[in-house]
Regions:
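Short, solvent-exposed helix-helix connector turns and helix-capping sites enriched
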Residues: 28, 263, 374-375
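Flexible loop/turn segments at secondary-structure boundaries
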Residues: 142, 149-152, 201-202, 209, ...
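Ferredoxin-type iron-sulfur electron-transfer modules in oxidoreductases and energy-metabolism complexes
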Residues: 212-229, 237-284, 288-316, 378-381
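Iron-sulfur cluster-binding electron-transfer modules in prokaryotic oxidoreductases
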Residues: 162-170, 218-220, 283-284, 291-454
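A short secondary-structure junction motif
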Residues: 18, 22, 209-212, 245, ...
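Membrane-embedded alpha-helical bundles of multi-pass integral membrane proteins
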Residues: 1-223, 239, 299-302
Length: 454
């Protein structure tokens, strides 16, 4: 429920990630500052501006948006230097972020990004008016200071310069249009917001709370997925880590484009399927969106799955061999590379280990490749078959040479009471226990650390 220990943790995460953008700071400090200045700076402008309005009006009730045009209506009230200074400081803080955001579109590498997101029309409109809101506010408040005095170190200084160098008639003529420009930019932004990337402002915060309350996306599409797709800010941080982009130049299938297309209901199979599911983008995502799960359940929904009875034939089949509490599952990749299987036979024999061979003479795949293709129901049949086989032979340790099998055994098989090891981990244990003797030689070996093993 909401009144739980997770609630204060969720509140702190909202402050840390939605306002201060800690994860983006880890990617690049300048990029983190840019996002923080826009989010946290605007938030403080709202809060401090509201406090200023309440203080000016004698602590009467004022709605939170009551400060937006306060400087337009409150030109004759006495100025309070503390608020003038704070509001100017916060406005400068936000303007520095706007400047960096504009610079990022020109030279993104200065902020550690080789590629940036290609935005759709709705994003471009919202982005353009967002960049104009705060310069328009600066000009509107400065011209007010020029005509009525007051202001802080920023608006007051600019206003004083205007008063000395611009004809008063021109100032009077521009006064209303500048406030209208600020108003129009602000209004256009909120009109465009639901149709743009900036919808994440209103979905990221509830997503954090729901995630803290243990709600997650699953292998099947669900209503919770909408929170995740809308919470993507399309920051583009997921683009550079993608190997399809960096090594092959494929630049239209990354998670930012997958989520965008899924949100607008024009997701193509080529975008959903053309992904290695390595998880690099998910690891870098500052919002913590479950990118692999969403892509997987999209594949499941879009796939034209054949007859679901086609895997029922292997129920009850047992082609395993041997006895022992240590089981060895070769997996498809090992069976396609017989030298690995022969090497493991020699290692088991040298260590004196009695082994149960799950699929030495052929068996059922671990199910992960089928699941990654979108056939989650068929993959579950394979997994259930293997689980029953492991339980039947009462193994306590399961060794595999295939990193793909290792990953799915550990993450999706729920093999309580069975220890799952990669053969490299198992060999290290044999060496430490003195059951496998090594001899120094002159040979040089190269070891490849697979992505799935990492």
């Amino acid at each position: 429920g909401i009144p739980s220990r997770q609630t204060p943790l969720a509140v702190w995460e909202v402050v840390r990630e939605s306002l201060l953008h800690r994860r983006i700071f880890k990617v690049n400090p300048l990029l983190g500052y840019m996002h923080m200045s826009l989010a946290f700076g605007w938030f403080l402008l709202i809060v401090v501006g509201w406090i200023e309005t309440v203080a000016y009006l004698g602590f009467r009730y004022v709605p939170l948006h009551g400060h937006v045009f306060f400087k337009y209506f409150a030109t004759e009230l006495p100025h309070k230097p503390v608020f003038d200074f704070l509001m100017d400081l916060l406005l400068l803080f936000v303007l520095s972020g706007v400047t960096l955001a504009f610079g990022k579109r020109i030279y993104s590498q200065a902020m550690g990004m080789r590629r940036t997101t290609r935005h759709v029309l709705g994003d471009r409109i919202a982005l353009s008016v967002l960049w104009l809101i705060f310069p328009a506010r600066l000009l509107a408040e400065s011209i007010t200071c020029a005509l009525h005095g007051g202001g802080g170190f920023l608006t007051g200084t600019i206003g004083e310069w205007m008063a000395h160098h611009v004809n008063p008639i021109v100032l009077q003529t521009l006064y209303e249009p500048l406030w209208w420009a600020y108003s129009i930019c602000l209004g256009l932004f909120f009109v465009a917001l639901p149709f743009s990337r900036y919808m994440h402002i209103f979905t990221e915060i509830p997503l954090i709370f729901l995630r803290r309350y243990k709600l997650h996306s699953t292998e099947k599409e669900g209503s919770f997925d909408r929170f995740q797709t809308d919470a993507c800010s399309r920051c583009g941080i997921c683009i550079d880590p993608c190997q399809l982009q960096s090594e092959l130049g494929i630049d239209d299938v990354q998670s930012v484009y997958f989520l965008r297309d899924r949100r607008y209901n024009h997701l193509r199979q080529s975008v959903a399927n053309n992904c290695l599911m390595c998880g690099r983008c998910e690891q870098r995502c500052p919002v913590g969106i479950e990118l692999n799960t969403l892509r997987l359940n999209s594949r499941d929904t879009m796939r034209n799955t054949p007859d679901e009875k086609r895997y029922e034939y292997f129920q009850g089949v047992d082609r395993s061999a041997g006895e022992g509490r240590v089981g060895y599952f070769a997996g498809c990749m090992t069976l396609l590379t017989p030298r690995i299987l022969l090497a493991m036979e020699r290692i088991f024999k040298a260590s004196g280990e009695e082994v149960w061979w799950a699929d030495k003479e052929g068996g059922v795949c671990c199910g992960r490749p089928l699941k990654l293709s979108g056939e989650t129901d068929s993959a579950r049949k394979m997994m259930d078959y293997n689980i029953a086989l492991f339980r039947k032979h009462r193994i306590t340790t399961l060794v595999t040479s295939c990193p793909i099998c290792l990953k799915v055994f550990r993450e999706e098989y729920h093999l309580e009471g069975i220890e799952v090891l990669h053969h490299s981990e198992y060999m290290l244990r044999l060496i430490r226990d003195g059951r496998l003797q090594l001899r120094r030689g002159a040979q040089t070996f190269t070891y490849h650390d697979p992505c799935e093993l990492g």
